[in-house]
Amino acid sequence: MGKSWFSAVKKALSPEPKQKKEQKPHKSKKWFGKSKKLDVTNSGAAYSPRTVKDAKLKEIEEQQSRHAYSVAIATAAAAEAAVAAAQAAAEVVRLSALSRFPGKSMEEIAAIKIQTAFRGYMARRALRALRGLVRLKSLVQGKCVRRQATSTLQSMQTLARVQYQIRERRLRLSEDKQALTRQLQQKHNKDFDKTGENWNDSTLSREKVEANMLNKQVATMRREKALAYAFSHQNTWKNSTKMGSQTFMDPNNPHWGWSWLERWMAARPNENHSLTPDNAEKDSSARSVASRAMSEMIPRGKNLSPRGKTPNSRRGSSPRVRQVPSEDSNSIVSFQSEQPCNRRHSTCGSIPSTRDDESFTSSFSQSVPGYMAPTQAAKARARFSNLSPLSSEKTAKKRLSFSGSPKTVRRFSGPPKLESNVTKKDTNLA
């Protein structure tokens, strides 16, 4: 590199290019001379714009060559100055080294140089480590590290958010499960309470319980048969009189054609048991009261009608005896007054019940004692009832076809016996 540069400088400084440049103008002069001759001969025909352009280009080339020559001379001078400076520096170092350690041997100077070299090596090593630390610090505090740190923090944030959502979902599922188990437990407790309400706490055995249920079923069947028998007889009486009590039909069950009393009795099958001792005592007391009233009525009838041996008097007395209010009729009237009116397919204020009440009041007014004298209206009502003895007998039979109360047994033998006794007494009196 240095040799080529130095050779280039020598060529620039050599006189050969000057001679060539000097030779060239001679040739050109010859050529220019010839051309002038030609130009003169040709009288300006060869002169053209092309020659002008060539001249300009040559001038530019000459200027460039001059500039390059001047630059080469300057660089050569600079190189010579640099070489001289280097030689001078070497001489200065040599002289300074000799003058730095005056009065010392070569061995001491060598040791000093070795120490300085080693110290320089250690200093360069420390400098290299320091540069590494600076470079590491720049890397740590650089943009890449910051970008990595931000991405790591974002990923950690998303991970924490996902963990929180999963934990919240688990808590919600556990709460829903607890609520579901609580509802199932409440439902189970309700079912258990319901089964406990229907539990039979009786100390009876299974056979006894089944026997009681069978007896109840048999009793209900007998009761239904008795009611059906009474209903069939009631239909015959209604067909004969055409004035029976009002029955009510159920559109869903056409065979359910009983009166409201029979249906009320059928709706309460467990209350129609046999007579208890209390009911028996009540029945006996009621019979004694009825017989006492009849015994009081008969002698007073003798005093009231001394001329009662005529057929008309017998005719009037016989219906009176038949229309004596018995215990069953009283119970029917009291039951009709106490029965509520809001039962299905029943009308408490029906026409047959009011007619039965009127007949009962008329019969009761005729069987009063002597100190309660009947009025003219009562006598007229009695005469009207005497005109239709057949209907009064049928109404009495109709009342006797039912039981006196829902808790007592039917009695069909009471009123006919009274009627027979009274008729016998009337015949004896006659």
Swiss-Prot record:
Residue ranges of the region described as Calmodulin-binding: 213-231
Residue ranges annotated as motif Nuclear localization signal 2: 396-403
Biased amino acid composition, Low complexity: 286-295
UniProt biased composition (Basic residues): 23-35
Subunit structure: Binds to multiple calmodulin (CaM) in the presence of Ca(2+) and CaM-like proteins.
CDD domains given in the database record: IQCD
Physiological role: May be involved in cooperative interactions with calmodulins or calmodulin-like proteins. Recruits calmodulin proteins to microtubules, thus being a potential scaffold in cellular signaling and trafficking. May associate with nucleic acids and regulate gene expression at the transcriptional or post-transcriptional level.
Gene3D superfamilies: 1.20.5.190
UniProt protein name: Protein IQ-DOMAIN 3
Gene name tied to this protein: IQD3
Keywords: Calmodulin-binding, Coiled coil, Cytoplasm, Cytoskeleton, Nucleus
Residue span of region Disordered: 1-36, 271-368, 385-430
Motif, Nuclear localization signal 1: chain positions: 9-16
Molecular function (Gene Ontology), one example: calmodulin binding
Homology family: Belongs to the IQD family.
A cellular component annotation (GO) from this entry: cytoplasm
Biased composition regions of type Polar residues, renumbered to the chain: 326-340
Segments forming domain IQ: 107-135
Source superkingdom: Eukaryota
Coiled coil residues, start to end: 170-224
Localisation per UniProt entry: Nucleus; Nucleus, Nucleolus; Cytoplasm, Cytoskeleton
One Pfam family this sequence matches: IQ
